[in-house]
Amino acid sequence: MMHGMTGTSAKMQPLAKQLVPEGWTILCPEAKIPHPTRGGFAWWLRSDNPIEPLNKYSLKQVDESISRVLEELPDGPLIIGGFSQGAAIASAMLETEIQERIIGLVLLGTKTIKPDKLREILPFLKSRIVVWMHGEKDHLVPLEQGIEHIEIFEDAGWPVKRLEHSKGHMVNLNQLEELKSEIQKMADSI
């Protein structure tokens, strides 16, 4: 489970512990790019409008972050997820050599980094469960961008559970049991 911008592994651990399926272990990688003004770490930095696509420099940081996470992953099946930037990294991991080991995705308050690439690859990959959560009042990742992301999976025929809520850029704890249930289904699918 990967944290968002300005997050840390330690900040992600409590949520991950609540969501982990029985018999599974938790890994919360930590991004390596220090946030210059707000503390914590980022998987990539950008100075332009967050609604716009990433520039080449930010995309390079994404690729470097993914490479670092890949080095930390254990052997065996994986449920990959995260919040905000961390979930975007999780989704992008479908473009890597470990994609066959991913049995489910947990995408919380996020958008896709490379929508065209995701559209291109998903039809050729074995579908797996995706649980998606996004807030209607999200001021950092607008709901429309979150919907664009999850619709790419739906359009490719992947099984998706949508958990939309009326709050902002956050995990809605009122939907925690539904989220846990979907993650348990992922674990039970192997």
Locate each region found by the language model:
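Alpha/beta-hydrolase fold nucleophile elbow
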Residues: 74-82
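A conserved short beta-strand
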Residues: 100-112
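C-terminal catalytic histidine-bearing segment of alpha/beta-hydrolase fold enzymes
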Residues: 144-190
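Flexible "cap/lid" loop of the alpha/beta hydrolase fold
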Residues: 38-44, 110-130
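Gly/Ala-rich beta-loop-alpha elbow adjacent to hydrolase catalytic centers
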Residues: 82-86, 90
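Serine-hydrolase catalytic machinery in alpha/beta-hydrolase-like enzymes
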Residues: 1-75
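Short beta-strand/loop motif that positions the catalytic acidic residue
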Residues: 131-134, 138
